[in-house]
């Protein structure tokens, strides 16, 4: 279950993960988005998630990216140049025809409160995996989502080890920062119209 980040008592989406050979055996009473795992032809829409798939050794299971101009990960850029990963347009202006031809088994998208922007993608009949990790209030909570993404590719063990490494490094850096004499401010993400996002 993915909770709605804007209405904490509501679900944004429920996913029912099943192996391809068991998909037909699931009772119809189970309500939620059915996703056959492991994913083999996914579409990613953020550089952060592309990088995570690289760390999980799953880039061969990426069929396309949205927002290509923001993705600067050498292995993925190389696969795009080789034609192994397609550029399917922008997140809010995807090339629907290209997505139909690609036949993805899932679309990884960031949810937004005004979700009407994905209405055409709903018509594809492809599961949309809402990546609400960016809404987490702490860095470690956001990083822990890598374990969720690991479920979709049957690499939970590797995802768990990656999270443990990130957690260890984060705690070490936090302890070091608390001991520093000067307090610096750090801005991440990007500046848009005078506001950092």
Regions found by a protein language model. Name each.
Residues 84, 95-97, 105-196:
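Extracytoplasmic substrate-binding proteins
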């Amino acid at each position: 279950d993915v909770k709605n980040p804007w209405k904490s008592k509501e679900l944004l989406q429920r996913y029912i993960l099943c192996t391809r050979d068991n998909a037909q055996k699931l009772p119809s009473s189970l309500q939620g988005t059915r996703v056959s795992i492991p994913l083999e032809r996914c579409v990613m829409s953020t550089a952060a998630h592309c990088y995570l798939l690289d760390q999980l050794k799953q880039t061969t299971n990426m069929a396309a990216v949205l927002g290509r101009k923001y993705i600067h990960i050498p292995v993925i850029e190389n696969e795009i140049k080789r034609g192994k990963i397609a550029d399917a347009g922008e997140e809010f202006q995807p090339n629907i025809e290209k997505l139909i031809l690609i036949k993805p088994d899932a679309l990884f998208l960031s949810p937004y409160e005004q979700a009407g922007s994905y209405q055409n993608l709903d018509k594809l009949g492809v599961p949309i995996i809402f990546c609400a990790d960016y809404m987490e209030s702490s860095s470690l909570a956001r990083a822990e989502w890598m374990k969720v993404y690991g479920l979709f590719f049957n690499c939970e063990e590797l995802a768990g080890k990656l999270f443990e490494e990130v957690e260890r490094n984060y705690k070490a850096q936090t302890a070091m920062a608390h001991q520093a004499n000067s307090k610096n401010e750090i801005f991440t993400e990007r500046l848009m119209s005078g506001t950092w996002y």
